[in-house]
């Protein structure tokens, strides 16, 4: 099984889309193994987006993601990195496909509702900013035999 890190940005929380987004993952057989609601600190945001430091959108992004509560999770399934990125759609909502989270609900590139790790390496780096190993719960999901 593969794992990935996902977090719902403040506008997803404020717009009441948390349940809808989680539902889309669960309906695909994706197992949530860690989940929390919290305010992201500036330090966490800067660590998460360190590769964008110096870019013209960096400060706006940091202010946005620290400006309200977020929901972070670690999810698990076969090929979950690829699957989650397919479900959420392109970073640019105008390029995101119909039926994707961003295609249906997002308005701008910066405020695109959701972030997901794009590789195993980034998952390993990103989830550790928000979760300790003992916060990840292993359990049997009934649909596991079907995936």
From Swiss-Prot:
<dbReference type="InterPro" id="IPR023005">
    <property type="entry name" value="Nucleoside_diP_kinase_AS"/>
</dbReference>
<keyword id="KW-0479">Metal-binding</keyword>
<dbReference type="GO" id="GO:0005524">
    <property type="term" value="F:ATP binding"/>
</dbReference>
<feature type="binding site">
    <location>
        <position position="9"/>
    </location>
    <ligand>
        <name>ATP</name>
    </ligand>
</feature>
<dbReference type="GO" id="GO:0005737">
    <property type="term" value="C:cytoplasm"/>
</dbReference>
<keyword id="KW-0963">Cytoplasm</keyword>
<dbReference type="GO" id="GO:0004550">
    <property type="term" value="F:nucleoside diphosphate kinase activity"/>
</dbReference>
<feature type="binding site">
    <location>
        <position position="102"/>
    </location>
    <ligand>
        <name>ATP</name>
    </ligand>
</feature>
<comment type="function">
    <text>Major role in the synthesis of nucleoside triphosphates other than ATP. The ATP gamma phosphate is transferred to the NDP beta phosphate via a ping-pong mechanism, using a phosphorylated active-site intermediate.</text>
</comment>
<keyword id="KW-0460">Magnesium</keyword>
<keyword id="KW-0808">Transferase</keyword>
<dbReference type="GO" id="GO:0006183">
    <property type="term" value="P:GTP biosynthetic process"/>
</dbReference>
<feature type="binding site">
    <location>
        <position position="112"/>
    </location>
    <ligand>
        <name>ATP</name>
    </ligand>
</feature>
<comment type="similarity">
    <text>Belongs to the NDK family.</text>
</comment>
<dbReference type="InterPro" id="IPR034907">
    <property type="entry name" value="NDK-like_dom"/>
</dbReference>
<feature type="binding site">
    <location>
        <position position="85"/>
    </location>
    <ligand>
        <name>ATP</name>
    </ligand>
</feature>
<comment type="subunit">
    <text>Homotetramer.</text>
</comment>
<dbReference type="GO" id="GO:0006228">
    <property type="term" value="P:UTP biosynthetic process"/>
</dbReference>
<protein>
    <recommendedName>
        <fullName>Nucleoside diphosphate kinase</fullName>
        <ecNumber>2.7.4.6</ecNumber>
    </recommendedName>
</protein>
<feature type="binding site">
    <location>
        <position position="91"/>
    </location>
    <ligand>
        <name>ATP</name>
    </ligand>
</feature>
<keyword id="KW-0067">ATP-binding</keyword>
<feature type="binding site">
    <location>
        <position position="57"/>
    </location>
    <ligand>
        <name>ATP</name>
    </ligand>
</feature>
<feature type="active site" description="Pros-phosphohistidine intermediate">
    <location>
        <position position="115"/>
    </location>
</feature>
<dbReference type="GO" id="GO:0046872">
    <property type="term" value="F:metal ion binding"/>
</dbReference>
<dbReference type="GO" id="GO:0006241">
    <property type="term" value="P:CTP biosynthetic process"/>
</dbReference>
<dbReference type="InterPro" id="IPR036850">
    <property type="entry name" value="NDK-like_dom_sf"/>
</dbReference>
<keyword id="KW-0546">Nucleotide metabolism</keyword>
<keyword id="KW-0597">Phosphoprotein</keyword>
<keyword id="KW-0418">Kinase</keyword>
<dbReference type="InterPro" id="IPR001564">
    <property type="entry name" value="Nucleoside_diP_kinase"/>
</dbReference>
<dbReference type="Pfam" id="PF00334">
    <property type="entry name" value="NDK"/>
</dbReference>
<keyword id="KW-0547">Nucleotide-binding</keyword>
């Amino acid at each position: 099984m593969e794992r990935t890190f996902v977090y719902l940005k403040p506008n997803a929380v404020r717009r009441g889309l948390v349940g809808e987004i989680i539902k889309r993952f669960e309906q695909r057989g994706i197992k949530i193994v860690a989940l929390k609601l919290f305010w992201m600190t500036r330090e966490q945001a800067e660590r998460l987006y360190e590769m964008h430091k110096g870019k013209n959108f960096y400060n706006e992004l940091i202010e946005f993601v620290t400006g309200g509560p977020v929901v972070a999770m670690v999810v698990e399934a076969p090929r979950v990195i690829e699957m989650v990125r397919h479900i959420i759609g392109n970073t640019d909502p105008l390029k995101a496909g119909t039926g994707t989270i961003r295609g249906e609900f997002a308005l701008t590139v910066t405020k695109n509702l959701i972030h997901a790790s794009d590789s195993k390496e980034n998952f390993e780096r990103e989830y550790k900013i928000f979760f300790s190993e003992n916060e990840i719960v292993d359990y049997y999901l009934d649909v596991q035999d079907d995936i």
